[in-house]
């Protein structure tokens, strides 16, 4: 069983609730899948034993860039559904706005567990390309 590690604390509950409503309205599961994750895939990270990862059109456009990017564009959204033993346990999402990432993790029912920029999120994600660890900048 994989260890589920959360991001620390719920720093921005109202923003997290609005973000949940937004990704539900946009039907994030209809978005493109992240590179390397064409279907539910095993995870070696802290977010469950299996994951589905979705990216919005801003990330899709960045990935298609013919030139090397140093960072993801504002408006980028990445959503990861995390599963343990086949059951949706949480939804982890990140959104880039004004050059800063906002992280949020919800339980399987959509209740906020963590939000904002908690140290556990930023500490782990700082190792990725502009804070994204699942795939690389083009």
Descriptions of predicted regions:
Residues 8-48, 58, 63-138:
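Sequence context surrounding c-type heme c attachment/ligation sites in exported
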Residues 4-6:
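C-terminal motif of bacterial Sec signal peptides marking the signal peptidase cleavage site
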Residues 55:
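His/Cys-centered metal/cofactor-coordination and adjacent catalytic loops
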């Amino acid at each position: 069983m994989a260890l589920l590690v959360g991001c620390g604390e719920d720093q921005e509950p109202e923003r997290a609730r609005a973000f949940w409503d937004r990704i539900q309205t946009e039907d994030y599961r209809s978005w493109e899948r992240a590179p390397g994750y064409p279907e539910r895939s095993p995870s070696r990270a802290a977010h469950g034993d299996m994951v589905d990862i979705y990216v919005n059109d801003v990330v899709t456009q960045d990935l298609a860039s013919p030139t090397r990017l140093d960072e993801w564009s504002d408006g980028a959204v990445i959503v990861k559904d995390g599963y343990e033993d086949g059951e949706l346990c949480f939804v982890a999402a990140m959104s880039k706005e004004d050059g800063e990432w906002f992280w949020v993790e919800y339980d399987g029912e959509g209740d906020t567990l963590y939000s904002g920029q908690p140290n556990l999120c930023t500490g782990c994600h700082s190792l990725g390309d502009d804070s994204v660890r699942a795939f690389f900048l083009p």
